[in-house]
Amino acid sequence: TPTEAFSYEESGTFRTTDLNYSVSRVGDSLSEQLTSYGFNVTHDKTYHDYPAYSGSYGRSMSTVQGILNNQPNSDIIIDLHRDAIADTSYAPSVQIGDEIASQLMFVIGTDGGGLEHPNWQQNLKFAISIQKKANELYQGYLDLF
């Protein structure tokens, strides 16, 4: 949360728990868009990297598993992050027409890091199909990692 010693800046790399300035606000917009296309959306706003970043992926996985247990017919789970990149030599943005947009990145977890991801290959295929369409519409908008 912003304090006197820290005030939020759009270009900043610090995390905040203020929902008006966090990735949850992006999730609100994404949820609205997906709902407008007829998708049934559950937007979980659990903080997984607060108070500590260490272990956040495992906590996120627990949240996703809980959603899948309660809503087993879910077709898509999006674990949305705002990764703060302090390295100024890398600019995670792309120009689309006259607008500058944040670049999207899909990070596909595998079984290699110690956490089980039994469907990672299906996730990768799905992400590639989205990347292909996104890049047809807006070249360079979506990367896979």
Enumerate the language-model features and the residues they cover.
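Long, well-ordered alpha-helical scaffolding segments within enzyme catalytic domains
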Residues: 24-31, 120-138
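A short, glycine/acidic-enriched catalytic loop
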Residues: 86-123
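Anionic group-transfer/hydrolysis microenvironments
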Residues: 81
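Short, intrinsically disordered/low-complexity patches at protein termini
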Residues: 66, 139-140
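Active-site-adjacent mobile loop/cap segments within catalytic or ligand-binding domains
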Residues: 142-145
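N-terminal catalytic or cofactor-binding beta/alpha core of small enzyme domains
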Residues: 1-75, 84-90
